[in-house]
Amino acid sequence: GIPGIYSSRYAGPEFPKGRPDGTKIPQDEQNRLLIAQLNNALAAGADTSRLKNGPRSAHYTCAMVLYLGNDRVFISQETMEGIIVEKIEDAAGTGGFGYDPIFFLPQYNKTAAQLTAEEKNAISHRGKATRALVRIINGIENI
C-alpha cells in the first residue's frame, strides 16, 4: 500500500516514491496528501474488502534480520495496526514522528503521537520486533 517503503519520501499520488529532485516535503504536507489520496480512493470505490480493520486500515511494519552466516539467518517481523484519520483536523499529538499524528489506534482512542514513549514502545512495530529479536539472540548458542 501507499506510502509503503517510500514513506519518508512520499510526495502525493504524483510522486509516491518521492520528488524527482530528491527534495522532501514537510511531514504535515505528507500527512495532508496521504489523507487526501485515501479519501479520493475511497470516494472512487476502492476495494477495501481485504482490509481487516475497515476502509481506513493502516499498519506500520518493522522487519529485522540477524545474519550470522549462510546457515544462521534469523528474522523478526512485527506490525502495529491502526487507521488513518478522516481529515487533517483530526491529527493529534506531539509525540512520535512522521505519520504518528494521523495514525489512530482505536484500542487506545489515541493517535500514535498521543501515546507516551513507554506506551508506544510497548505496542509499536519496532518495539515488538526488537523484543522478538532479543529473544532469538538470547536463545542462540555460540553467537
Segments predicted by a language model, with ranges:
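Anionic-ligand binding patches
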Residues: 1-143
